[in-house]
Amino acid sequence: MAQKVEAQGGNGGNQWDDGSEYDAVTKIQVAAGGNGIEYVKFTYVKNGQTEEAPLRGVKGRSFEADPFVINHPEEHLVSVEGRYNPEGLILGLTFKSNKKTSDLIGYEDGTPFTLQVQDKKIVGFYGFAGNNLHSLGAYFAPLTNVTPLNAKKLEAKGGDTGDIWDDGVYDNVRKVYVGQAQYGIAFVKFEYVNGSQVVVGDEHGKKTELGVEEFEIDADDYIVYVEGYREKVNGMTSEMITFLSFKTYKGKTSQPIEQRPGIKFVLQGGKIVGFHGRSTDVLDSLGAYISLSPTPNLHGKWTKVDENGDGPGLRCSHDIAQVGNKIYSFGGEFTPNQPIDKHLYVFDIESRTWSISPATGDIPTLSCLGVCMVSIGSTLYVFGGRDASRQYNGFYSFDTTTNEWKLLTPVEEGPTPRSFHSMAADEENVYVFGGVSATARLNTLDSYNIVDKKWFHCSTPGDSLTARGGAGLEVVQGKVWVVYGFNGCEVDDVHYYDPVQDKWTQVETFGVRPSERSVFASAALGKHIVIFGGEIAMDPLAHVGPGQLTDGTFALDTETLQWERLDKFGGEEETPSSRGWTASTTATIGGKKGLVMHGGKAPTNDRFDDLFFYGIDSA
């Protein structure tokens, strides 16, 4: 709620009030006559739309000054200085913004007054007017209602009814108050910090007898993650927020995060420095402002790669791998649970052209989905995947110099047959982790040595690394890392396996952590593991539906165990849209190493056929 500063002058004429719901004042028109100020007229901006208020006073044979124009959002109105006479008429006015001051309009006689509040801006006016302007008062709002260039406004999630509110942007969030209603969240209120000043925000919604929960953030900590659920409840025509949990950079959580009814949403991507949304008697929606780090440890950029020729087309649940200047694609589906083909597609990076690779030898007998593929040298290695009747493929190699397939291990002789597992490789070993067999999810890790041509069953990881599918699997500095996945619900734990010691270790990560997810794109880039998108909540129809998919590019530093978000909002970068079940690999394009991904499942349950590359500039 804006701060109302008392009107100065008299109370003759009629009372008027432009209101306080605007974002800023953008233009002021004033006319002065023999008795002082004859009229004022203000133009405001609200949600990007210009709104002209009525003329306050009467147009006569007066001198109309040049309009005082305020260049929102870089400029804002700070104060008004004026004078009024004993009869209660405003004689003169001067307006000041943070960048300039208007000329005096009217006379310098009379009693002086000033409308100003430190660290706030004027967002509305009110007063009395008849044939002249009798009095003038103002509404003030925090300066932080203007989004700074280094902050990003995240769209509010939830319903589209209720009053719009916006607390603006601050240095930090100090406290969070959440009030409960019978079916969800009744109200929220936030306390912020601006420099040494504590700013108490308004209550959004309405308190009930069910109480209020308070979450305090330490002075050296900040919120990086909000998880919520939205749902239409009790016959409502629009969604409301039914659950909220706040998590800080140091891992402090306001509420235990667990699966709940409704549609899950997350607000994340950096330090959260403000909130906005809609409310009625309940909290209808919630969005946030995030402060983006100006100097990420890993620098890169997304580009969409042009594609020509006969390629894989629209599909998901396939895999890709790079050999030299070519990217290979195998497996996948267009219709849920229906494999498309068993072609091996090859993309020439130089010509940007897809084609179907010639193939001889032990060509895989099954068209499959949920397959994995990696490369070592000039050879591709393909394991698992299933057809529509849940028959599984074995373990194959493909020599890209001779275009020959070889069946290295039949289904019945190798690791447990599976789909939606994860694969990675180093110079001599292919690693296969997790996935879904005919009867259960798995948490085993097997390695195949390409020199000895033998499988090795790695040590059992223990209870902390639950059986899962759709995890990220990358080899970084000799360790095999398992990142996130799905074990019946989305998880966010991270583990690594040391092949030398045959030992598993779970690690605690921190920073701007991505939310729980699976079936995301991933790549190993130096000491970092970079991921994009994925599924954050399973669809009620399981693999038949799209699930709840997300976007976002994150990097985990495997030495410091710190996560950071890499996306550059706006500018020339063409960031991929939300997706999961995409094919991805570590690749080099145009001399840059990065994450390349193809296709995937869209939130609409459609399929993508695009090719994106996140190329690293420096690390």
Swiss-Prot record:
<dbReference type="InterPro" id="IPR001229">
    <property type="entry name" value="Jacalin-like_lectin_dom"/>
</dbReference>
<dbReference type="InterPro" id="IPR033734">
    <property type="entry name" value="Jacalin-like_lectin_dom_plant"/>
</dbReference>
<dbReference type="Pfam" id="PF24681">
    <property type="entry name" value="Kelch_KLHDC2_KLHL20_DRC7"/>
</dbReference>
<dbReference type="GO" id="GO:0030246">
    <property type="term" value="F:carbohydrate binding"/>
</dbReference>
<feature type="binding site">
    <location>
        <position position="535"/>
    </location>
    <ligand>
        <name>Fe(2+)</name>
    </ligand>
</feature>
<keyword id="KW-0677">Repeat</keyword>
<dbReference type="GO" id="GO:0016829">
    <property type="term" value="F:lyase activity"/>
</dbReference>
<feature type="active site" description="Proton donor">
    <location>
        <position position="441"/>
    </location>
</feature>
<feature type="binding site">
    <location>
        <position position="386"/>
    </location>
    <ligand>
        <name>a (Z)-N-(sulfonatooxy)alkanimidothioate</name>
    </ligand>
</feature>
<protein>
    <recommendedName>
        <fullName>Thiohydroximate-O-sulfate sulfur/sulfate-lyase (nitrile-forming) NSP4</fullName>
        <ecNumber>4.8.1.5</ecNumber>
    </recommendedName>
</protein>
<keyword id="KW-0430">Lectin</keyword>
<feature type="repeat" description="Kelch 3">
    <location>
        <begin position="429"/>
        <end position="478"/>
    </location>
</feature>
<dbReference type="GO" id="GO:0005829">
    <property type="term" value="C:cytosol"/>
</dbReference>
<keyword id="KW-0456">Lyase</keyword>
<dbReference type="InterPro" id="IPR015915">
    <property type="entry name" value="Kelch-typ_b-propeller"/>
</dbReference>
<dbReference type="GO" id="GO:0009506">
    <property type="term" value="C:plasmodesma"/>
</dbReference>
<feature type="binding site">
    <location>
        <position position="543"/>
    </location>
    <ligand>
        <name>Fe(2+)</name>
    </ligand>
</feature>
<feature type="binding site">
    <location>
        <position position="581"/>
    </location>
    <ligand>
        <name>a (Z)-N-(sulfonatooxy)alkanimidothioate</name>
    </ligand>
</feature>
<feature type="repeat" description="Kelch 4">
    <location>
        <begin position="480"/>
        <end position="524"/>
    </location>
</feature>
<comment type="function">
    <text>Specifier protein that contributes to constitutive and herbivore-induced simple nitrile formation. Promotes simple nitriles, but not epithionitrile or thiocyanate formation. Converts allylglucosinolate and benzylglucosinolate (glucotropaeolin) to their corresponding simple nitriles in the presence of myrosinase.</text>
</comment>
<keyword id="KW-0408">Iron</keyword>
<feature type="binding site">
    <location>
        <position position="519"/>
    </location>
    <ligand>
        <name>a (Z)-N-(sulfonatooxy)alkanimidothioate</name>
    </ligand>
</feature>
<feature type="binding site">
    <location>
        <position position="441"/>
    </location>
    <ligand>
        <name>a (Z)-N-(sulfonatooxy)alkanimidothioate</name>
    </ligand>
</feature>
<feature type="binding site">
    <location>
        <position position="419"/>
    </location>
    <ligand>
        <name>a (Z)-N-(sulfonatooxy)alkanimidothioate</name>
    </ligand>
</feature>
<keyword id="KW-0880">Kelch repeat</keyword>
<feature type="domain" description="Jacalin-type lectin 1">
    <location>
        <begin position="2"/>
        <end position="142"/>
    </location>
</feature>
<feature type="binding site">
    <location>
        <position position="539"/>
    </location>
    <ligand>
        <name>Fe(2+)</name>
    </ligand>
</feature>
<keyword id="KW-0479">Metal-binding</keyword>
<feature type="repeat" description="Kelch 2">
    <location>
        <begin position="379"/>
        <end position="425"/>
    </location>
</feature>
<dbReference type="GO" id="GO:0009845">
    <property type="term" value="P:seed germination"/>
</dbReference>
<dbReference type="Pfam" id="PF01419">
    <property type="entry name" value="Jacalin"/>
</dbReference>
<dbReference type="GO" id="GO:0080028">
    <property type="term" value="P:nitrile biosynthetic process"/>
</dbReference>
<dbReference type="GO" id="GO:0019762">
    <property type="term" value="P:glucosinolate catabolic process"/>
</dbReference>
<feature type="repeat" description="Kelch 1">
    <location>
        <begin position="326"/>
        <end position="374"/>
    </location>
</feature>
<feature type="domain" description="Jacalin-type lectin 2">
    <location>
        <begin position="151"/>
        <end position="292"/>
    </location>
</feature>
<dbReference type="InterPro" id="IPR036404">
    <property type="entry name" value="Jacalin-like_lectin_dom_sf"/>
</dbReference>
<feature type="active site" description="Proton donor">
    <location>
        <position position="386"/>
    </location>
</feature>
<comment type="similarity">
    <text>Belongs to the jacalin lectin family.</text>
</comment>
<dbReference type="InterPro" id="IPR006652">
    <property type="entry name" value="Kelch_1"/>
</dbReference>
<feature type="binding site">
    <location>
        <position position="470"/>
    </location>
    <ligand>
        <name>a (Z)-N-(sulfonatooxy)alkanimidothioate</name>
    </ligand>
</feature>
<dbReference type="GO" id="GO:0046872">
    <property type="term" value="F:metal ion binding"/>
</dbReference>
<feature type="repeat" description="Kelch 5">
    <location>
        <begin position="528"/>
        <end position="583"/>
    </location>
</feature>
